[in-house]
């Protein structure tokens, strides 16, 4: 992940933990620095089990295996988060389709998008506001309102000029 993304995740994770008690971790295996064999599903499951034993519930872990090109989103307890919905609706559409697209920027965008949506879902469940998160749906609503106001203003100006010129 790129540096800005790491700083964003650390800040949001800290705020999420302080407000909800839920830990949210992104685990990215770095095969250049730590060459462990995780190409097979069984190897990844064993790695995940070992990693998850270190954490105390409630938690969410986002596993990203670069070389295997696999992603796992794990929540404990399982009803903490709808991991399948987040994966298939928010992460899967951004998955690279070939090896050339596996750039650090693309990976960061994909992980941050899924992470941000998951944090929003947790914040909503715990009735808290995570200030440092993107809050994408709220931003989209704000932009739509501004566009509608501008359109109505232009329409009003046009109609006003049209009717006042006639009289």
What are these regions (language model features)?
Residues 1-141:
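Folded, non-transmembrane soluble domains that reside on the lumenal/extracytoplasmic side of membranes
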């Amino acid at each position: 992940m790129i540096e800005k993304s790491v700083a964003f995740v650390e800040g949001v994770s800290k705020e999420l933990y302080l407000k909800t008690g839920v830990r949210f971790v992104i685990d990215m295996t770095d095969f250049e620095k730590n060459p462990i064999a995780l190409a097979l599903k069984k190897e990844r499951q064993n790695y995940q089990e070992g990693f998850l034993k270190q954490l105390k519930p409630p938690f969410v872990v986002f596993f990203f295996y670069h070389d295997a090109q696999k992603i796992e989103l794990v929540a404990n307890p399982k009803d903490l988060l709808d991991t399948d919905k987040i994966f298939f609706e928010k992460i899967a559409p951004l998955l690279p389709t070939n090896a050339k697209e596996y750039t650090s920027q693309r990976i960061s965008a994909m992980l941050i998008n899924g992470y941000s949506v998951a944090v929003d879902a947790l914040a909503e469940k715990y009735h808290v506001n995570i200030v440092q998160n993107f809050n994408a749906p709220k931003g989209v609503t704000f932009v739509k309102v501004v566009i509608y106001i501008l359109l109505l203003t232009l329409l009003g100006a046009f109609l006003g000029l049209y009717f006042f010129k006639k009289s």
